């Protein structure tokens, strides 16, 4: 059975986890408030509390046998909390990695359309932080980046 670890079981992360679980995946993931997931998670899911300044307990065990790691967690104060706390723990990860970013990385183009190949040129601090986080995820884990519009 394949295992997915999802940092941030919120709107996007939870939907993704539910879809993977229906296909037979084992789910591990984090949330700031585990009680909010009551009734929304499957049997056998491993849910861990995660806040931006507290590393997960026993990360070696938590990341063992994980095939996929995905982060939906925002960059905070210009930095990525997942890689800040667990970058070293994930150095030897050889599975697939994904980072859910936002379209705020694109320039402000009110009279035009941005495409996936539009060069990043964020107009906001949040967008600038996302660009840095994307780069870190790509450089360290070879992550694929998904830029969600309108929800981040």
Kindly give the residue locations of the regions a language model identified.
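Conserved beta-loop-beta element that borders a ligand/cofactor-binding pocket
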Residues: 135-152
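Conserved Rossmann-fold cofactor-binding substructure of NAD(P)-dependent oxidoreductases
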Residues: 42-65
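Active-site "gating" loop of Rossmann-like NAD(P)-dependent oxidoreductase/epimerase domains
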Residues: 103-125
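N-terminal Rossmann-fold cofactor-binding loop
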Residues: 29-35, 51-52
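N-terminal Rossmann-fold NAD(P) dinucleotide-binding loop
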Residues: 13-14
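Aromatic pocket-lining residues of Rossmann-like dinucleotide-binding sites
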Residues: 20
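NAD(P)-cofactor binding segment of oxidoreductase domains
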Residues: 59-100, 105, 132-135
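Conserved N-terminal Rossmann-fold NAD(P)-binding element of oxidoreductases
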Residues: 3-8
């Amino acid at each position: 059975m394949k295992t997915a670890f999802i940092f941030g079981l919120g709107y996007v992360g939870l939907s993704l986890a539910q879809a993977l679980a229906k296909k037979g995946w084992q789910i591990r993931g984090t949330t700031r408030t585990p009680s909010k997931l009551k009734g929304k998670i499957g049997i056998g899911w491993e849910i861990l509390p995660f806040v931006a300044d507290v590393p997960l307990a026993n990360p070696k065990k938590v990341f063992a046998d994980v095939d996929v790691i995905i982060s939906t967690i925002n960059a905070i104060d210009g930095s990525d909390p997942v890689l800040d706390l667990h970058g070293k723990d994930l150095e030897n990860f050889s599975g697939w990695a994904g980072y859910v970013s936002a379209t705020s990385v694109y320039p402000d183009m009110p009279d035009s359309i941005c495409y996936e190949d539009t060069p990043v040129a964020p107009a906001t601090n949040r967008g600038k932080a996302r660009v840095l986080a994307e780069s870190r995820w790509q450089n360290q884990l070879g992550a694929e980046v998904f830029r969600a519009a309108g929800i981040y």
